[in-house]
A protein has these predicted regions:
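Hydrophobic/aromatic-enriched cytosolic interaction surfaces used to assemble or bind macromolecules
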Residues: 1-264
């Protein structure tokens, strides 16, 4: 009967949907993280993480990525997302943005090499474009392997996540995102972005220096400005007590800013 046939087809479709997976790849010059998760409930099915003490060449990262993907069962992957986390990015207000000038925007704060290609993410909430270096060898490989995928810069989703949670009051909040690769410092006044930058760091003293540098550069008074530490809880806890000795109005936010929580 057609009813039975229809029911069987629906069951097959539901079963197929339940088995569908999404693959998230996060790449920086020090990290390679792969997450395989269920497309329905975002439950992590498999993951692999590598951290390198020193920055490595992007060709080496591509080789590592190829090897890591061999360890995953990619049969039911229906969505692939690449997240690039590097310092090679700059925010350009929409009124000044021209697609053809992306590399020109970057050359003022990034060391470019021959054959570098640029891409951009539009952040609607901030009316700005996040311009960054896209690793051409990585994107070309993923096109060959998966056919299609989406990609964006880590700071794009980080800014979107923070902006979504902000209220309309005019309080100044400094977000200090500490991850193993870099230190992101972002300043909002209400829902207006005042500052965003990424720094290299090796010690808790470096973190303190850059936070105080941003406070001074933006003419903020540290005993009136709220500072929130975000990122991986284990890393934050390693630095919180030290920072608290010098900056009193500081607090730890939850781990909702981890890559697996802000990429859908």
């Amino acid at each position: 009967m057609e009813i039975g046939l229809q029911h069987m087809t629906q069951s097959q479709e539901i079963n197929k949907l339940e088995k569908s997976l999404s693959l998230i790849i996060m790449i920086s010059s020090k990290e390679l993280k792969l997450l395989l998760r269920n497309s329905i409930d975002s439950k992590i099915i498999d993951q692999n993480y590598s951290f390198y003490a020193e920055e490595i060449e992007i060709d080496k990262i591509l080789s590592e990525l190829k090897n890591k993907l061999k360890e995953f069962n990619l049969l039911n992957v229906v969505k692939v997302t690449l997240v690039l986390n590097n310092k090679l990015s700059v925010l350009v207000p929409n009124d000044f943005f021209q697609e053809d000038n992306c590399l020109d925007y970057l050359k003022f704060n990034s060391r470019l090499i021959k054959n570098d290609t640029a891409s951009s993410d539009y952040i609607e909430e901030l009316k700005t474009h996040n311009v960054y270096i896209a690793y051409g060898n990585i994107t070309n490989y993923l096109i060959e392997k998966f056919g299609s995928f989406e990609y964006f810069h880590y700071s794009t989703v980080l800014l979107k996540k923070i902006h979504f949670e902000l209220s309309t009051n005019k309080k100044i909040i400094i977000y200090v995102n500490i991850n193993k690769s870099y230190l992101n410092i972002i300043v909002f006044k209400g829902r207006e972005l005042n500052y965003s930058n990424t720094f290299d760091y090796k010690s808790k003293e470096d973190i303190l220096y850059f936070v105080l540098f941003v406070i001074e550069q933006n003419k903020l008074v540290n005993n009136k400005t709220k500072i929130k530490l975000i990122g991986e809880e284990k890393i934050i806890n390693q630095h919180y007590a030290y920072l608290l000795k010098f900056i009193k109005n500081i607090e730890i936010k939850n781990s909702g800013y981890l890559i697996e929580n802000i990429v859908t």
